[in-house]
């Protein structure tokens, strides 16, 4: 299979750098493992730690927390808030997300997705009650160790003092201008045009809101002036905003290629990802990895099967009776194996962000946050954009609109463990997330190469009866896919194909390596 390289940056701690032609660079797993023997920082040899995220400033701030003795959870709160400032188009306090936490003594998933309001009158809103701030507070109060005010400070600094805009944000503002531009967004569109790459973006209103949260906790967001601003802009009642609740769920757990897999429970799509992985294993899809058309068509087949099962059986567990662990059992997968599945049709915006953190104690955080679409609805209040998550509901079935409900999402933060190896991985990409992650893990677990090299390879995804590819396929491959019932279209948008972030800890060598996706400015660092 052909591969392409992106690249612009040189990442610290890499002796040999993998160059990729886009934005962002990460180190090759094999090269760093074999060649880089660095001394641990001033904390001594008490363990290794690392951060993988879609913006270098978020990685830097997360590493500072870990270096100073903070936990993976502490660093995750910092990274989440910083991404909401410096990658504000993909996530933020006006949205929500989910966080998978796997440690030696706990396995938990925190769901802080946006919810539908109860009090809407005759209208059906597009904006859900934001869950991000409540989620961060719950995670801190139950799993964090450092003071919350301290964890908020880096994000406040970047909002108040500013940061250098990268070309990803400039491009996103340019593409979104017809949809979101207004005079209220002059800090993003000085003189009516997107702020240029390299310019400093200062977000005074956001800094003010973050300081209010720092001082008053989540109450400063869900009550008072910020809540009134949300209510006025989003047409959501103050009762709905104040009444937001975080959900704590058990991760879905299964086995794949000898790995124990922990992944996000419904209404997230860890079930779908794990089903696809297990179907790929049972159908021995990897045998055809070097035959492009066959490999693609088999991946499309298992996508159809798993997505159909998702559509029929998954939804908000507060509204739908289901057993997600049963749905990833070997017995259940065997019943799915011979199904055909419907054409892939359920849509979801690709505009999310993912990060992974591993601390000295081996605790892994794999988290995906979102506004749904880039910049959400485009509606802006109190310094942040409001989500458009409610557009992800369907008209009928388990994903139909109901008050207080969370819509289904394709997000699937995941952790895999086997023989002293721990992998934290995930991606943005909307309805393509399981399709993006499955071939990557299929190739990695079969030893095709380093995780970074596999992430660098060109991708393909499917929707309805069309295969979307990053490169132009040969006429021979396209003709073969056509005979299998698939049209082929080249898609020029890198963000369309996700932004996989990952870390791998090898406990035998006490080394952390990682992978970052140049499609979305991805990078990573470790102390060893």
Curated annotation (Swiss-Prot):
Name it: Capsule biosynthesis protein CapD proenzyme
- Describe PTMs of this protein: Cleaved by autocatalysis into a large and a small subunit.
- Identify its protein family: Belongs to the gamma-glutamyltransferase family.
Give the residues the record marks as binding poly-gamma-D-glutamate: 352, 429-432, 520
**What job does this protein perform?**
Transpeptidase that cleaves the poly-gamma-D-glutamate capsule and catalyzes the formation of an amide bond with the side-chain amino group of meso-diaminopimelic acid (m-DAP) in the peptidoglycan scaffold. Degradation of the high-molecular weight capsule (H-capsule) to the lower-molecular weight capsule (L-capsule), which is released from the bacterial cell surface. The production of L-capsule is essential to mediate escape from host defenses.
Alphabetically, which GO biological process terms does the record hold?
capsule polysaccharide biosynthetic process; proteolysis
- The EC category is transferase
EC code: 2.3.2.-
Query: Superkingdom, according to UniProt?
Result: Bacteria
């Amino acid at each position: 299979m052909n591969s392409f390289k992106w690249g612009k940056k040189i990442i610290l701690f890499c002796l040999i750098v993998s160059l990729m032609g886009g934005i962002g660079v990460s180190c090759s797993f094999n090269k760093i493992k074999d060649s880089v023997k660095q001394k641990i920082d001033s904390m001594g040899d008490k363990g290794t730690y690392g951060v993988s995220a879609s913006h270098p400033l978020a990685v830097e701030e997360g590493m500072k927390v870990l270096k100073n003795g903070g936990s993976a959870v502490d660093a995750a709160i910092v990274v989440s808030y910083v991404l909401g400032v410096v990658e504000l188009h993909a996530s933020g306090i006006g949205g929500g997300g989910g966080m998978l936490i796997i440690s030696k003594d706990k396995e938990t998933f925190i769901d802080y997705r946006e919810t539908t309001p109860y009090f809407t009158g005759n209208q059906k809103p597009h904006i859900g009650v934001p869950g991000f701030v409540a989620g961060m507070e719950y995670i801190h109060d139950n799993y964090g160790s450092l003071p919350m005010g301290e964890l908020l400070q880096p994000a406040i600094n970047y909002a108040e003092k500013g940061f250098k805009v990268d070309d990803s944000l400039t491009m996103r503002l340019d593409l979104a201008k017809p949809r979101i531009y207004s005079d209220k967004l002059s800090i993003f569109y000085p003189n009516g045009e997107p702020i240029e790459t390299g310019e400093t973006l200062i977000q005074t209103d956001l800094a003010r809101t973050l300081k209010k949260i720092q001082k008053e906790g989540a109450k400063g967001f869900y009550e008072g002036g910020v809540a009134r601003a949300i209510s006025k802009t989003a047409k959501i009642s103050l009762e709905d905003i104040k009444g937001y609740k975080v959900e704590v769920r058990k991760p879905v757990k299964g086995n794949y290629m000898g790995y124990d897999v922990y992944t996000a429970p419904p209404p997230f799509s860890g079930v779908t990802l794990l089903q696809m992985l297990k179907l790929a294993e049972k159908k021995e899809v990897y045998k055809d990895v070097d035959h492009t058309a066959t490999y693609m068509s088999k991946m499309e087949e298992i996508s159809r099967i798993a997505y159909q099962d998702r559509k029929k059986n998954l939804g908000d567990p507060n509204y739908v009776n289901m057993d997600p662990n049963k749905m990833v059992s070997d017995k259940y997968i065997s019943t799915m194996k011979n199904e055909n599945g419907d054409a892939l049709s359920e849509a979801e915006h690709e505009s999310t962000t993912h990060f992974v953190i591993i601390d000295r104690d081996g605790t892994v955080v794999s988290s995906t946050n979102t506004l749904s679409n880039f910049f959400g609805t485009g509606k802006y209040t109190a310094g942040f954009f409001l989500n458009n998550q409610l557009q992800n509901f369907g008209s009928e079935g388990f994903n139909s609109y109901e008050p207080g409900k969370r819509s289904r999402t394709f997000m699937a933060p995941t952790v895999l463990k086997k023989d002293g190896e721990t992998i934290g991985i995930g991606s943005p990409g909307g309805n393509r997330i399981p399709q993006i992650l499955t071939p990557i893990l299929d190739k990695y677990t079969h030893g095709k190469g380093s995780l970074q090299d596999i992430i660098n390879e060109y991708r393909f995804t499917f929707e309805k009866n069309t295969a979307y590819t990053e490169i132009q396929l040969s006429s021979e491959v396209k003709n073969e896919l056509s005979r299998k019932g698939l049209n082929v279209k080249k898609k020029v948008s890198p963000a369309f194909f996700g932004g996989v972030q990952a870390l791998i800890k090898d406990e035998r060598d006490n080394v952390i390596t990682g992978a970052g996706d140049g499609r979305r400015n991805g990078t990573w660092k470790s102390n060893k």
